Structures are given as C-alpha cells and as structure tokens.
C-alpha cells in the first residue's frame, strides 16, 4: 500500500518556493514515485512555527526549505526539527519531531552528485528549531544566503535530488542511528551520511549537550523514525561530563555506542576523518 508524502514549503521562503516550483515543473503538484504518493503543499506561515494540522492524513513530511547561517558558503543540508533544549525558533521546549533518517541520507547522497559542479558544499545538520511534529519529518535545504536561495542551478539541483531521494528511499536499507557531539555542521557526521551504511536521524550538537539527559536520549531514540540500536559519538566534540552522561544513558537503553572516527576508519580507511 502506498504512503502519502507531503512536500511542504512556505510562501515566505524563496528557497522552499523555488524548490517547489522546480518540482512542479518536472512532476506537477501531485505525483507518485515508487510507493509514495507525493503532494506539494504551500503554507502561509514560516514552517518553523506551524502546528502540523495541515498534514493530517499524510504519513511523512518533507520540508523544502532555506538554510541560514553557517558556513557562509553555498551548501545543501538536511536535518530533522526539534529542540533538545529551550525552543528559541519555534516548536516546543525539550521536544523532538519524529525523524526520517533514510530520506535525509538519500537527499545528501543525491545532492552530493551535483554539488561540486555548481560550487556547493553538502552538510548534515543536528536537530534544531521548530516545528515539533508527530509526523515523520525531514528538512531538505539549500543555503545559506539570499543569493543561494534564488540560484536557479542550485534550486534545480535540490529539486532533482529530492525526487531522486524519494525514489531511492526504502525502509531497512541503512542502519539507523542517533548521533551526539561536535559543531553545528559536523564534517564527520556528514561523511557518515555520504559514505557509510549508517543513516543518522536525531543528532545533538555540543552546544545542546548540556540539555541531553536520560529522558532526552530516550526521546531521541524513540522518535528516530526507524528501529535504532546504534549511537554515534563525536568523542572530542563533547565535554567529558556531557559525554559520560549521554553514553551512560545510551547504554542503559541497550544501544551500541560507536565513536565516529572508528566508523570512518573501519568503513572508509580514514585515521582522522577528512574534511569535505
């Protein structure tokens, strides 16, 4: 039985609107890919502040969105929404949306095939900002400034990658994981997404680690969207007390805790993990 996928964008967002326009030109407003029935949905508000009522009856939500901020270079990014700590930009305090690890990974893999040719980078982002939704959600983005948000080549590359990702996305294809540590865009986690068998859903950056107690760890795992038995830790990207608390909570839940550099060494032959 096919599943319903909402491809949502805000009319206030030039990047999301541009991605949607490119998809509409290629596929129309409603279309089927593989076992997914897809529908483009425009919302009036900024996506960060919606409550999700627009998506009743859908099984999944992919948000076509702009990326803002770091690294001050054209980039394609993916992440799930939610707040490990206080909600500064939409959503609820200490609540995470349900993730779609495999779709996020497939988007990054697909867009990486197009990025270098047009001068873009690719980056995996941690869980951050609103909304906090009870529908499996993935933000698929282009950034990080007004120029990139309106760049026709970038928007076309993003749109093509969204469609390719939906086509490739299959349950159980990858090993779902949660991740902890490091900067906002963690090159190590990005390489895990692009080149290994693991698909990361929720990830807490070093900046949010102080909020990650046992309950937040449990929530990250339970709302990761796919059965999750692995946690990837950026050992040097966490304070000692935060790392001990988080790893203890993960082990209490029965998860296998793996250092990110071990994954890169074992699967890619990297000693330290190269930057991309």
Curated annotation (Swiss-Prot):
This is D-aminoacyl-tRNA deacylase. D-aminoacyl-tRNA deacylase with broad substrate specificity. By recycling D-aminoacyl-tRNA to D-amino acids and free tRNA molecules, this enzyme counteracts the toxicity associated with the formation of D-aminoacyl-tRNA entities in vivo. It comes from Korarchaeum cryptofilum (strain OPF8). Binds 2 Zn(2+) ions per subunit. The lineage of its organism: Archaea, Thermoproteota, Candidatus Korarchaeia, Candidatus Korarchaeales, Candidatus Korarchaeaceae. Keywords: Hydrolase, Metal-binding, Zinc. Its cofactor is Zn(2+). One of its GO terms (molecular function) is zinc ion binding. It catalyses: a D-aminoacyl-tRNA + H2O = a tRNA + a D-alpha-amino acid + H(+); glycyl-tRNA(Ala) + H2O = tRNA(Ala) + glycine + H(+). Belongs to the DtdA deacylase family. Monomer. GO terms for biological process: D-amino acid catabolic process. Its EC number is 3.1.1.96. InterPro entries: Deacylase_DtdA_archaea, DtdA. It is an enzyme of class 3 (hydrolase).
């Amino acid at each position: 039985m096919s599943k319903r996928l909402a491809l949502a964008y805000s009319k206030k967002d030039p990047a999301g609107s541009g991605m949607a326009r490119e998809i509409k030109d290629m596929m129309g407003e409603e279309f089927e890919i593989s076992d997914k029935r897809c529908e483009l949905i425009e919302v009036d508000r900024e996506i960060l502040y919606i409550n999700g009522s627009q998506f009743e009856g859908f099984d999944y939500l992919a948000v076509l969105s702009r990326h803002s901020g770091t690294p001050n270079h054209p980039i394609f990014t993916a992440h799930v929404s939610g707040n490990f700590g206080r909600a500064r930009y939409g959503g609820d305090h200490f609540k995470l949306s349900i993730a779609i690890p495999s779709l996020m990974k497939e988007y990054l893999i697909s867009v990486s095939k197009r990025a270098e040719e047009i001068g873009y980078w690719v980056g995996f982002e941690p869980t951050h900002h609103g909304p906090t939704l009870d529908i499996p959600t993935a933000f698929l983005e282009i950034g990080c400034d007004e120029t990139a948000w309106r760049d026709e080549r970038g928007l076309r590359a993003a749109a093509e990658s969204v469609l390719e990702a939906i086509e490739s996305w299959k349950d159980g294809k990858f090993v779902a994981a949660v991740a902890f540590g490091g900067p906002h865009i963690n090159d190590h986690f990005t390489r895990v997404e692009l080149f290994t068998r693991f698909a990361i859903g929720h990830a807490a950056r070093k900046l949010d680690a102080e909020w990650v107690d046992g309950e937040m760890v449990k929530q990250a795992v339970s709302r990761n969207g796919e059965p999750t038995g692995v946690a990837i830790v950026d050992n040097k990207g966490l304070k000692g007390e935060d790392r001990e608390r988080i790893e203890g909570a993960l082990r209490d839940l029965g998860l296998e805790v793996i250092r990110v550099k071990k994954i890169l060494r074992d699967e890619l032959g990297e000693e330290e993990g190269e930057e991309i």
